[in-house]
Amino acid sequence: MKINARFAVMAASVAVLMAAAPIAQAATSPGDIHPLVQAAHSPDGIPGNGVGPEFHTSSMARSYSEKHLGVAPRGVNDFSCKVKPGDRPVILIPGTGGNAFATWSFYGPHLAHEGYCVYTFTTNVPVGILDEGWGFTGDVRASAQALGAFVDRVRKATGSEKVDFVGHSQGGGILPNAYIKMYGGASKVDKLIGLVAANHGTTAVGLDKLVDGLPEAVKDFLSTWSYDHNMEAYGQQLKGSALMQQVYRDGDTVPGIAYTVISTRLDTTVTPYTCLLYTSDAADE
């Protein structure tokens, strides 16, 4: 599995190059949204291959999820769960290349143990490369639409007017914010907590400038490759992408939602770390 993991990381890094500037241009047209690609073992996003153990490191959880595609964390996705007065359902959103178990095998059970109704999902996986354990690699806008459908399902099951989000990387940044700002989510979310969330786009340690310098013919080829393999999310998260500008052009936040962002100077993927921070232009917190 070490070889597979290294290959996966390498492929994901290459995808950053292959998905960048051309996809950012395509993002200006809603008609160009790549259709959502479902994970075979997670119909409608719901992991359907049993429940796995709790892991304390992401690498261990990732390894287990690769051997058990579609596995879920303990305690999540109980659609008969009764939300306690004053609480809201908590939706855990993985990041790019993540999945429900690899990202949330530790947090999911602990939140459920504290009495929260907890939900998570995996969707928008690659085509013809990697496997379905690498979720949310496709067009962020398609993932945002899928998030909206998941939110509505949770709200209907629990009778709750609003939900709380806890998201990692893409799942705490551009994905929930695209849903909130572009797909009617503003009235359905009470809190958004982002863990190392690239709200203003990442420089990917200089890859953004490298991509900008590629010849147009190379960009066109790589754009087609990333579309064919459903890997657009990497480029859409680079600093300056058209989708970043579209999502954040009217400010970072919207009224009525409480925002929390937790960042670290030690992150080597979402760089610089200051791109993680919200301004206080419209936030409740």
Residue ranges of model-derived segments:
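Acidic catalytic loop of the alpha/beta-hydrolase fold
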Residues: 266-270
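Flexible, membrane-associating and regulatory peripheral segments of lipid-active enzymes
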Residues: 2-110
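Catalytic nucleophile-loop/oxyanion-hole region of alpha/beta-hydrolase
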Residues: 130-146
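Conserved small/polar residues in nucleotide/adenosyl-binding loops
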Residues: 278-285
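Short alpha-helix in the alpha/beta-hydrolase fold that links the catalytic acid
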Residues: 271-277
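Serine-dependent carboxylesterase/thioesterase catalytic core
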Residues: 94, 143-247
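Short beta-strand/loop motif that positions the catalytic acidic residue
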Residues: 261-263
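Conserved alpha/beta-hydrolase
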Residues: 112-129
